[in-house]
């Protein structure tokens, strides 16, 4: 919005010429997102407390979690506001990729909101059924996959890090592949959101990593030099990624141990889906497995646990997702959280290193 209002006036007011710089708008999207969280945070927490939107803690989980009983949840609405508002203010709103990602951000946020509202406000413990949630997730992700597949100039090739000449064309299978990436990322983040700050920290790190890759993908010279897939217009997603980083840090202000508020499904489903959509548009889907390694490990721990119990009658972990396994082994919650953040930072550095490893 500010870009469209002020940049056209740059001929008369030279100061407004700064709005053409992507780096400037990305930095201020990040700062704006932080401010949105700081301004809205206390109010959102009070409203959630007034609605009795409080987290219900499982009695079969770690005993230390019982003290979290009654903590407000659905704080993801704050995150959504802190992503959407700065993006609308600082991004070039004529860019189709911005609206494509916001479609997933808001759409998945609505799915999570309805599920949370039914569970914690209407006191319906089932919320949306898994089948209902999956239906809407697949529908929205499939719509994005179809849009990209039919978009002129956007190819259906899969780019694999470390292999500069290996670009298999997925053709029609690109649509289910996009669906898998977005839905998988969404649910992986959702499974990770089990400790104070455990999910939002890696999400912010992932967003910062994709902020860099979005900028490179949209830059003709840099993408050619680094042999990164060139996606004209994808650079604008750096602004949205910047907003995600700011929103993540702002929410962490309230969600760090001991948490004053939880993000709920409205936050986790939306954030994961957003990362998946950005990965797809920047042609860095495989990279998400690297930088989002913590999310992958958390999801796989659940899959292996369920599969092992179903077919062998035995559990691999004391409890899944794997962060609960470490809790039951006596590792303190803050230590698990910080260690997972450290691992994510290392994985992000590995992901960034692929820019020079072709």
From Swiss-Prot:
Membrane topology reported for the UniProt record: Multi-pass membrane protein
UniProt main location, coarse: membrane
Pathway: Cell wall biogenesis; peptidoglycan biosynthesis
Class of enzymatic activity (EC top level): transferase
Domain of life the protein comes from: Bacteria
Pfam family of the protein (one): Glycos_transf_4
HAMAP family in the cross-refs: MraY (MF_00038)
NCBIfam families documented for this protein: mraY (TIGR00445)
Annotated protein name in UniProt: Phospho-N-acetylmuramoyl-pentapeptide-transferase
Organism: Pelobacter propionicus (strain DSM 2379 / NBRC 103807 / OttBd1)
Recorded name of the encoding gene: mraY
């Amino acid at each position: 919005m500010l870009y469209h209002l002020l940049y056209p006036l740059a001929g008369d007011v030279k100061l407004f010429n700064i709005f053409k710089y992507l780096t400037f708008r990305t930095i201020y999207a990040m700062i704006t997102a932080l401010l949105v969280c700081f301004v809205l945070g206390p109010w959102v927490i009070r409203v959630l407390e007034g609605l009795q939107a409080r987290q219900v803690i499982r009695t079969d989980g770690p005993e230390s979690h019982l003290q979290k009983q009654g903590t407000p949840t659905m704080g993801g609405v704050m995150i959504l506001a802190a992503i959407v508002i700065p993006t609308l203010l600082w991004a070039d709103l004529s860019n189709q990729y911005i609206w494509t990602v916001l479609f997933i951000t808001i759409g998945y946020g609505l799915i999570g909101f309805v599920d949370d509202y039914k569970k914690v406000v209407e006191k319906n413990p089932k919320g949306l059924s898994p089948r209902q949630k999956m239906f809407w997730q697949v529908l929205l992700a499939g719509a994005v996959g179809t849009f990209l597949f039919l978009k002129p100039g956007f190819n259906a090739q899969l780019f694999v890090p470390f292999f500069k000449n290996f670009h298999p064309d997925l053709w029609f299978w690109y649509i289910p592949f996009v669906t898998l990436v977005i839905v998988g990322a969404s649910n992986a983040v959702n499974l990770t959101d089990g400790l104070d700050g455990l999910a939002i920290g890696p999400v912010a790190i992932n967003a910062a990593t994709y902020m860099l890759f979005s900028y490179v993908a949209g830059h003709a010279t840099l993408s050619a030099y680094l042999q990164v897939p060139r996606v004209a217009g994808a650079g604008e997603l750096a602004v949205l990624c910047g907003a995600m980083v700011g929103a993540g840090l702002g929410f962490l202000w309230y969600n760090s141990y001991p948490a004053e508020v939880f993000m709920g499904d409205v936050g986790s489903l939306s954030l994961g889906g957003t990362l998946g959509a950005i990965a797809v548009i920047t042609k860095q889907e495989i990279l998400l497995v690297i930088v989002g390694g913590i999310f992958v490990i958390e999801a796989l721990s659940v899959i292996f646990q369920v599969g092992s119990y179903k077919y062998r009658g035995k559990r691999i972990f004391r409890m899944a997702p794997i962060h609960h396994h470490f809790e039951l082994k006596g590792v303190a919650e803050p230590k698990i959280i910080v260690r997972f953040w450290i691992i994510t930072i290392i994985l992000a550095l590995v992901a960034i290193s692929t820019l020079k490893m072709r």
